[in-house]
C-alpha cells in the first residue's frame, strides 16, 4: 500500500498486545489469495497452542510464553477481488480446505468467517451458503462502502461538499439496509436457526484522499456528515442484530472513516469516534423493537433513524439521528410496556462541515442534552445526532 517499505515491525505480537491494551477481541484475517494452507495453519497454532510444537516454541522464543485467546478468524478477505479474483464456487472449495486445518487448540474456540459478498453480489452469498456446511462456517462477511456519487474514480472531497452531495452520501449509506435484508433472506433459507452470522466487517465512507497525501494511504478527514453516516449504519446494524453479531468500521486509525487521526505524537478524536462513544451502551444489551414517525429530508432520505436496547439491569438506551440539514424535530419518546421515570441525554451536533483538527481538536464533541420527562414520556429537541439513556429500571405505571 502506497509503494513504501513494510518492515513488519508491527506484527502478530504487537497487534495482539494492542488488542489487550484497548480491551477488544482480535480479528485475524488469513491469506487465502497468495498464502498456503500450511502457512495459515501454522499461524493459528503459533497463536493458540499451549503445548510442545515448533510453532509454540517459536512463539515462546519471540517473547510470549502463554498462547493468546483468538476467537475471530477470517479465512481470506475480499476473495472476489483483491484477495484472489475468485469465483464463489472456487472460493467455497478453498474455504473448506483452509478451514479444515485451522484447528481449535488448548481450549481455544475459533469463530471462522468466510470471505462474503461485495455489496449486492447475492449470488456469492447463495453459493457459499449452499456449498459451505454451517458447522464449518460461523460467519460470512459483507463489505459495503458509502461513496457519495457512486463513482469510484471521482468520489468527492471529505470536507468540501454541497447540500446535493451531502444527501447523495446519506442516500448511498442507506442502501446497505436493503442489501442486509436480501443477504439475510438467502441465509435464512439455508440457516433458519441463524447459526451463521452476517459480519459487516468493512463499512464506512470512502472519499478522495486529502490533497498532498499518499494516494495509497487512503487518508481522509472526518466531518459531521460522517457522524450522521456512522449513526445511521449503527442503527441499521442494531435493528438487524439477529443476523449481524459483529460490524467493523473501516478503518480505526488514519484510513478512510477513522475514529482517530494521528500526526506524529498527536492524536485527535473524529466526529465518528464520538458516535461510537454514544452508541457503545448498546453493546451486550438486547434489542428492543422501536418505531418512529418520519418524514423525508430529501428524496429517498428519511430524516430520522433510531434503535433501542435494554441491558441486564433494565436500563433502556435509545439512539436517534437526524439527517436533515434544515429541520429540527421535537421527539416524544414513549415505551409501550412501561413508563419512563427519569432520563438523561447527550448530543453530538454542529455544522455539517464541522471537523476536528490538530489545531482545534475539540470543535466537535459530545454535550449534555436537555430531556424533559412528564407523564411517563420523554421529550427532546432533535437537532442532529442524539443519544438518550434511561438510567433507572423501567417500571410499569398503573
Residue ranges with predicted function:
Residues 325-338:
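Surface-exposed beta-strand/loop patches in extracellular or lumenal glycoproteins
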Residues 339-382:
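Acidic, Ser/Thr/Pro-rich beta/coil linker or hinge segments at domain junctions
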Residues 386-392:
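Conserved small/polar residues in nucleotide/adenosyl-binding loops
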Residues 195-306:
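Aromatic/acidic polysaccharide-binding cleft in carbohydrate-active enzymes
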Residues 1-162, 181:
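N-terminal catalytic cores of secreted or lumenal carbohydrate-active enzymes
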Residues 314-322:
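Short, well-ordered beta-strand segments enriched in hydrophobic/aromatic residues
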Residues 31, 59-60, 101-122, 176-205, ...:
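Aromatic-lined carbohydrate-recognition surfaces of secreted/lumenal glycan-active proteins
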Residues 147-214:
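Glycoside hydrolase catalytic-domain groove-lining segments
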Amino acid at each position: 500500500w502506497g509503494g513504501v517499505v513494510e518492515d513488519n515491525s508491527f506484527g502478530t505480537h504487537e497487534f495482539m498486545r494492542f488488542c489487550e491494551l484497548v480491551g477488544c477481541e482480535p480479528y485475524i484475517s488469513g491469506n487465502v489469495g497468495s498464502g498456503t494452507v500450511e502457512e495459515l495453519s501454522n499461524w493459528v497454532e503459533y497463536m493458540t497452542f499451549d503445548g510442545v510444537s515448533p510453532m509454540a516454541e517459536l512463539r515462546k522464543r519471540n517473547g510470549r510464553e502463554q498462547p493468546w485467546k483468538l476467537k475471530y478468524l477470517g479465512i481470506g478477505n475480499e476473495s472476489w477481488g483483491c484477495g484472489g479474483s475468485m469465483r464463489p464456487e472456487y472460493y467455497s472449495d478453498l474455504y473448506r480446505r483452509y478451514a479444515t486445518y485451522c484447528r481449535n487448540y488448548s481450549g481455544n474456540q475459533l469463530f471462522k468467517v468466510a470471505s462474503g459478498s461485495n455489496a449486492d453480489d447475492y449470488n456469492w452469498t447463495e453459493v457459499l451458503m449452499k456449498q459451505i456446511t454451517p458447522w464449518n462456517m460461523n460467519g460470512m462477511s459483507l463489505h459495503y462502502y458509502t461513496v457519495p456519487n457512486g463513482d469510484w474514480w471521482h468520489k468527492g472531497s471529505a470536507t468540501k461538499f454541497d447540500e446535493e452531495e451531502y444527501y447523495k452520501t446519506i442516500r448511498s449509506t442507506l442502501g446497505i439496509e436493503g442489501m442486509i435484508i436480501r443477504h439475510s433472506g438467502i441465509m435464512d433459507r439455508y440457516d433458519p436457526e441463524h447459526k451463521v452470522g452476517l459480519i459487516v466487517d468493512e463499512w464506512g465512507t470512502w472519499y478522495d484522499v486529502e490533497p498532498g497525501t499518499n494516494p495509497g494511504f487512503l487518508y481522509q478527514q472526518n466531518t459531521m456528515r460522517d457522524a450522521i453516516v456512522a449513526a445511521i449504519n449503527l442503527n441499521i446494524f442494531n435493528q438487524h442484530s439477529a443476523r449481524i453479531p459483529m460490524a467493523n468500521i473501516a478503518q480505526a486509525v488514519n484510513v478512510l472513516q477513522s475514529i482517530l487521526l494521528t500526526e506524529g505524537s498527536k492524536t485527535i478524536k473524529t466526529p465518528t469516534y464520538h458516535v461510537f462513544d454514544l452508541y457503545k451502551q448498546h453493546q451486550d444489551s438486547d434489542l428492543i423493537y422501536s418505531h418512529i414517525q418520519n418524514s423525508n429530508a430529501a428524496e429517498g432520505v428519511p430524516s430520522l433513524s433510531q434503535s433501542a436496547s435494554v441491558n441486564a439491569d433494565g436500563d433502556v438506551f435509545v439512539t436517534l439521528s437526524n439527517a436533515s440539514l434544515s429541520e429540527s424535530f421535537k421527539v416524544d419518546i414513549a415505551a409501550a410496556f412501561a413508563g419512563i421515570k427519569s432520563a438523561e441525554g447527550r448530543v453530538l451536533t454542529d455544522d455539517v462541515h464541522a471537523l476536528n483538527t490538530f489545531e482545534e481538536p475539540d470543535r466537535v464533541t459530545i454535550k449534555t442534552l436537555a430531556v424533559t420527562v412528564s407523564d411517563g414520556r420523554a421529550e427532546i429537541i432533535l437537532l442532529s445526532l442524539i443519544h438518550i439513556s434511561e438510567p433507572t429500571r423501567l417500571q410499569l405505571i398503573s
